[in-house]
Amino acid sequence: MNEGVAEASERMLKGAGAFAHETPYAVGKHYRQINSSPDVYLVRVPFLNISTSETNCYLICDGDECLAVDTGAPTPEGAAPLDAAIDELGIDKARMSFFLTHLHMDHAGLIDHVAPKEAPIALSLTDFNLMAASSDAEYLRITEAQVSAEGFDCDLVYKSARYGMGIPSFKPEGRNLKFVAEGDVIVVGQTKLEVVDTAGHTPGHLALFHRGSGLLFSGDHILFAISPGLGLRLGVVDTMGVYLANLQKVCDLGISRLLHSHGEIRPDWRERVAWLKNHHCERIEQAAAYIAEHPGATGADVVKNLTWNVPQAWEDIYPAQKWCIVEGGIIILNHLIAEHRIAREPDANNIHHYTLL
């Protein structure tokens, strides 16, 4: 599932501008044109982590206007190719606007660097509120209680529960924020792009659809390099159900090309959607089967006995990966609850136990 650290490092060191062999369109040192009408330029912004080495950021240009879809992570190594691509293309930052598919650091982290204060920034109100709430101590306390109730050690929460939470991706004060949702239209020159709700990876994850060309700027909704993580967030009853429904929504849109955020752009996105659906459904059934064989199992029992692409020993798993597994496992349990397939009962210590219905 995850690209090795050595391989990711090698890719990052090659730089974001190694595009010459990949396109019939215009190629610059730090960008690659991937579409005309509208003109779309791909900029790879490096950011080395466990599973990906770059964020695919897109510049949509029409006349003297430009919309940037995501910005990448806030590192000097990331800022350099994005700045260089903007300069190479002769884009006036005063005529730029921004669209954030979601507010994870590797997507929104360069806003403070690249976006002028007055630049319009289109984003999800749901994810914005989440970013604000997750920096509050009460949010972490409630998350700790939720995870502890599944039978995981409190130490795991303190080491891992703030992964992806509690650190704002940018400073919103004084920003020209434009909260958008399903059906809203963003205009760049003469180009109109429709906002599509693709919640799942985050509760407010958004995509942009250009109906004329069939392009979908899809963020982390569908990836080839990894299976997108589904975030455990307070107040969301069935993240898995929402995500699976939104995978189907993309298939029904009539898109021609999926422009995702990590890894190479590929044409076989429908096959990938089918794989992702099957991948999640297999794990859901595995959880149900374990509960059938072990009635009264705790959430931790179930999650630790599912198949994950990680070291076999729980203690050997990276904290960030461990947190993603805990999130994903609880989301599966929540989905089975929402589907009325299992029951969740707390014991005297408020530890949840599961049985089939």
Where are these regions (language model features)?
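Histidine-centered divalent metal-coordination motifs
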Residues: S97, T101-H107, H201, H205, ...
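Short Pro/Gly-enriched beta-strand edge/turn motifs at strand-loop
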Residues: L13-K14, S37-V45, Y163-S169, G189-T191
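Conserved beta-strand hairpin/beta-sheet module of binuclear metal-dependent hydrolase folds
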Residues: H30-L89, K93, A207-F224
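C-terminal regulatory/interaction regions
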Residues: M1-P24, Q286-L357
